[in-house]
Each structure stands twice: as structure tokens, then as C-alpha cells.
Swiss-Prot record:
Similarity comment text for this entry: Belongs to the AMT4 thioesterase family.
Segments of skewed composition (Acidic residues): 136-145
Described function: Thioesterase; part of the gene cluster that mediates the biosynthesis of pyranonigrins, a family of antioxidative compounds. The first step of pyranonigrins biosynthesis is performed by the hybrid PKS-NRPS synthetase that condenses 6 malonyl-CoA units to an acetyl starter unit, to form a 1,3,5-trioxotetradecane-6,8-dienyl-ACP. The enoyl reductase (ER) domain of pynA is likely to be functional during the first two rounds of polyketide chain extension, to generate the saturated C-C bonds of the alkyl side chain. PynA subsequently forms the amide bond between the acyl chain and L-serine.
Cited InterPro entries: AB_hydrolase_fold (IPR029058), Thioesterase (IPR001031)
Gene for this chain: pynI
GO molecular function (one): hydrolase activity
EC number: 3.1.-.-
Pathway per the UniProt entry: Secondary metabolite biosynthesis
Keywords for this protein: Hydrolase
Identification of the protein by name: Thioesterase pynI
GO-annotated biological processes: biosynthetic process; secondary metabolic process
Taxon lineage: Eukaryota, Fungi, Dikarya, Ascomycota, Pezizomycotina
Organism of provenance: Aspergillus niger (strain ATCC MYA-4892 / CBS 513.88 / FGSC A1513)
Region annotation (Disordered) ranges: 136-167
Disruption phenotype: Aabolishes the production of all pyranonigrins.
Length: 280
């Protein structure tokens, strides 16, 4: 997983960079589908846009504010927490962009470990399929054989370039599987007030890009939990409390959560992001 992914724009631009945080997979690759987020076709004058695989890399990109943060799904949840942490350090966060991100404080906990495992495995399979790597979904956690192959040099043999590339790819997907399991558990165990204290104010503007279509499947096995997740998805602000921010607005898009970066919708998402960034 690349810790910092340069998505587009001039790295030396005087414009404030937009930093996207990874979604549940731990990868920032979905943001690569976005079109030009600058109102210019001149690469030398375009806003730099990055994706990061961990919040800690924001300081490497930008030691001090003002910050522009954003994220899809879990990435938006993390962006809100990052904004609070940065402001506690006296940094300015100009804008947080939530791409269909539900407030995790309202997200229901898993009923049991089995539900968590099944749902996390299902999400992992979906990500693999979206990346055109469906064949890796079933064997990415089979570390023993790959460990033996990686250690082959100990007995004097070496892997071919093709074998090494295959080994690295499987290790990437194994890491992604573990990340999805840890991330889904983290989201479902976020207690009220853990992300933002109820009466606190995070001094930033927040724009929520909300999908109006419900996903075809709900990540839950039990009906009570399914209903709770659907209520969250139908909520006008996806359960965020506008009073927790200086400014909160919602933009609607006729799409489903998992299709935001598909060819059918990505042009509209790009246009929305350009509109948001015009004032930044």
C-alpha cells in the first residue's frame, strides 16, 4: 500500500492541497478515477490532490494548515477526526468533504464475531472484484505457501521476477483483508461522543455529498441491524450533527454508495468537488 498517492495536480502549486483519506480497504486508489479538480487545464497551475493510507502522512505532505480534507465512506469519518486533532494543535482546517460518509457513532455494532467475519469477508470480495482481482479473494489469506516461497533464498534458491511480483500482490491483498476486518470493527464500535463530543464545535466547513439511492445489499446479517443501517443511510445528514461544525451543507447525487467512482457518476462527483473547491 502506497502511504502517499499523488493523484493529480502540481506538487509545487501555491494552492492548498486536497488530501483524501483511504476508505475501508486502506487504499486511496478509488480517487484516481476522479477527473480534473482544478478550474484550469494548465498542469502547472492545478491544485495538488493526494490520497493517503494513514492520517499520519498528512504532516509529511503539509506540516501546517490550512488543510483541505476529504474522504469516501470511512475516509470521511477519519477526516472529521483528523480535523478535530489538527485544530487541537491550533491548525486551521478550511474544509472537510464527506463522500457519502455516515457518522460512525450511530452505526450499529456487530451482533457477534461471526457476523463481523462474514461481512468483512464480503466487503473484501467486493473490493477484489471492483479491482478486477476476484481470483485473489479466496486465497489472499493463505500466507504459509507464500512465506515458504519468500524464504526460498534461505536454501540458496531465488524467486523469478514473476514469482516475486505474484508474491507481493498476494501480500498486498492479505494486508488489505486484515485492514478491512480491523476497519469494519472500528466503525461498528465507535461509541457516541467518541468521534466528536456532542456539544463541541469543530471550526471548519463540512460538505456532505450524499447518495440518494440505497445500496442493493446492506452489510448486516440480522434484520434489526439492517434496519438501523438503512435508517442511517436515509437520514438527511447521514446522522452528522450540523451544530458540531461552523458550516454544514449537503449536496445530493442520484447514485449508490459503491458506484460513486463508476464511469456513470464520476463526472458529476468531479463537478461537485470542483464546485466545493472554488471557495478554497
Amino acid at each position: 500500500m502506497e502511504p502517499i498517492l499523488h493523484i493529480q495536480g502540481d506538487a509545487h502549486s501555491s494552492l492548498t492541497p486536497l488530501i483524501f483519506i483511504h476508505a475501508v480497504s486502506g487504499l486511496a486508489w478509488p480517487y484516481m478515477a476522479l477527473g480534473n479538480l482544478s478550474n484550469t487545464s494548465d498542469p502547472a497551475r492545478s491544485r495538488p490532490v493526494y490520497g493517503i493510507s494513514s492520517p499520519v502522512y498528512s504532516s509529511e505532505l503539509q506540516p501546517h494548515g490550512p488543510y483541505l480534507l476529504g474522504g469516501w465512506s470511512m475516509g470521511g469519518m477519519i477526516a472529521v477526526k483528523m480535523a478535530e486533532i489538527l485544530q487541537a494543535k491550533k491548525e486551521t482546517v478550511q474544509q472537510v468533504i464527506l463522500l457519502d460518509s455516515i457518522n460512525p457513532e450511530k452505526y450499529p455494532a456487530f451482533v457477534n464475531e461471526e457476523e463481523h467475519r462474514i461481512i468483512a469477508d464480503g466487503l473484501f470480495t467486493n473490493v477484489c472484484q471492483a479491482m478486477g482481482m476476484a481470483d485473489l479473494a479466496d486465497d489472499s489469506d493463505d500466507e504459509d505457501n507464500r512465506s515458504d516461497a519468500s524464504d526460498a533464498s534461505d536454501d540458496g534458491s531465488t524467486m523469478s521476477d514473476e514469482e516475486e511480483e505474484d508474491d507481493n500482490l498476494h501480500r498486498l491483498f492479505s494486508t488489505m483483508r486484515r485492514h478491512i476486518h480491523a476497519s469494519t470493527l472500528s466503525i461498528s464500535s465507535t461509541e457516541p461522543g467518541k468521534l466528536l463530543p456532542p456539544n463541541s464545535v469543530c471550526h471548519t466547513s463540512v460538505t456532505l455529498v450524499k447518495c440518494t439511492q440505497l445500496s442493493e445489499t446492506v452489510p448486516a446479517l440480522f434484520s434489526a441491524r439492517q434496519r438501523c443501517i438503512r435508517r442511517c443511510a436515509l437520514h438527511p445528514t447521514l446522522q452528522w450533527r450540523p451544530q458540531n461544525f461552523d458550516r454544514f451543507r449537503t449536496l445530493l447525487i442520484d447514485a449508490r454508495h459503491d458506484s460513486l467512482f463508476d464511469e456513470e457518476h464520476v463526472e458529476e462527483v468531479t463537478s461537485m468537488l470542483r464546485q466545493i473547491l472554488e471557495s478554497c
